Amino acid sequence: MSLKISNFIDASNTKGPIRVEDTEHGPILIAQKFNLKDLFFRTLSTINAKINSQILNEQLKNYRLENQKSLLLFLNTLASEKSAESAFAAYEAAKNSIQHSFTGRDIKLMLNTAERFHGIGTAKNLERHLVFRCWGNRGITHLGHTSISIKNNLLQEPTHTYLSWYPGGNVTKDTEINYLFEKRSGYSVDTYKQDKLNMISEQTAERLDAGQEVRNLLNSKQDQNNNKKIFFPRANQKKDPYGYWGVSADKVYIPLSGDNKTKDGKISHNLFGLDETNMSKFICKKKADAFRQLANYKLISKSENCAGMALNVLKAGNSEIYFPLPDVKLVATPNDVYAYANKVRQRIESLNQSYNEIMKYIESDFDLSRLTQLRRSYLKSFNKINLIHTPKTFKPLSISLYKHPTENVSSEDFDAVINACHSYLVKSAPSNMTRVLNELKTEATDKKEEIIEKSIKIIDYYNSLKSPDLGTKLYIHDLLQINKLLLNNSHSNI
């Protein structure tokens, strides 16, 4: 029996060292509490880091072998389930702490790093999505960077919009101090490839080239005694096809609202997601302003540095509907905006998951006669709306008792469905929920943002119920179905 990542996740909830024990059925993980032996060797390790004693090294050797066995098994498992590159990145993130012991905290840190290495988010598998990229801030000597790209491969001519904000002009000794506070002209590069090249210094690139040269010599046995320091690349440092070093970013893939398709061709729809049109307009305008030298860059800024500009794009896409904007005090940083983008992603994914579960339940597991009875007060209007606006995906369930809708759909049809569903929810809910239910009631004339906010409230209300009855599930489903049609501008023909 081989171990899986899930076994390490289960073991990570303990505070003590995690070790491997071999059994006749295969290796198992043993989670222990810290004891005096662990404390003793941790202290020795700390002392030895300063004095580098050969005697202490021997004492620590066997103790560390126990940690290394657990660590190597974890890294091999991680490499097989994800990738060797992500396992390498995970090791880099935790290599200092695992010198003492291999703990649940180390597992969580390395799993999070491995997950971020290839990008997080279910939207990665979709043909339409937003990618937030972050090169993290590691202090004043490495400020980091952010960029945003919007991809749409569903169009006849696919689009890829990119924004990565930089200051114009060169920094000299005379302008170095003012560089932090003064406004300068701003501009955007057009590709992720350019960003990767920009994120590595000439000095680092030279060291990486020198290290590669030494390794090549040693591998060919032409120079066994070369005394140059071998400089190894990190997991996110790679050469491009032209021989230039670059640094990959941490990526967050965020869903866009509306119709979509998976990379294997499966049709999907996101009721919740960022607004592609608004964000694309913002990016195009900002780049046009930069071309006319009307756009600014300011490093110490809430909105005019790279992170602030990325935050502006998310805001244009209505991100604050899903999660409040971060409280930026003085300057927007890549790390803070990355954390915010990830929270937006998590909220959108959670809402879409709940929405899809509600849709799937009613549309696949239902009693036709019972649902027809529950819809009797608004069945005619419901069928008219659905048959006209979704003829290709419409199911027989909705057209029972009303097979020939010839009248035009009116706002009264939308109101009939909304009022009937809302009325049932109010009657079946506790009296203290009336205000909440009134806030989620959609009007056919509501703006797009209002419909999204009310759809979120519908989902949150549904998730707050412990055991909703069939009627509640159906009316929640129908309200969300109406909201979906309204968001698709179905009411523009009313």
Curated annotation (Swiss-Prot):
Its EC number is 2.3.1.-. Changing residue 450 to V: In plasmid pINV_F6_M1382. The active site is at 145, 195, 306. Disruption phenotype: Decreased virulence in vitro, able to escape the vacuole, required at an early post-invasion stage. Bacteria no longer escape autophagy. The keyword Nucleotidyltransferase does not apply. It is found in: Secreted; Host vacuole. Changing residue 183 to A: Does not affect cytotoxicity. It catalyses: L-lysyl-/S-(2E,6E,10E)-geranylgeranyl-L-cysteinyl-[protein] + octadecanoyl-CoA = N(6)-octadecanoyl-L-lysyl-/S-(2E,6E,10E)-geranylgeranyl-L-cysteinyl-[protein] + CoA + H(+). Changing residue 297 to A: Does not affect cytotoxicity. Changing residue 76 to K: In plasmid pINV_F6_M1382. Changing residue 105 to K: In plasmid pINV_F6_M1382. One of its GO terms (molecular function) is acyltransferase activity. Residues 171-247 are annotated as: Involved in binding IpgA. Changing residue 336 to N: In plasmid pINV_F6_M1382. GO terms for cellular component: extracellular region. Its main location: secreted. Belongs to the BopA/IcsB family. Virulence-associated N-epsilon-fatty acyltransferase that mediates lysine-stearoylation of host Rho GTPase proteins, thereby disrupting the host actin cytoskeleton. Required at the post-invasion stage of Shigella pathogenicity. Contributes to bacterial escape from autophagy. The icsB gene can be read-through into the ipgA gene to create a translational fusion protein. The biological significance of this process is unclear. Interacts with its chaperone IpgA. This is N-epsilon-fatty acyltransferase IcsB. It comes from Shigella flexneri. The gene is icsB.
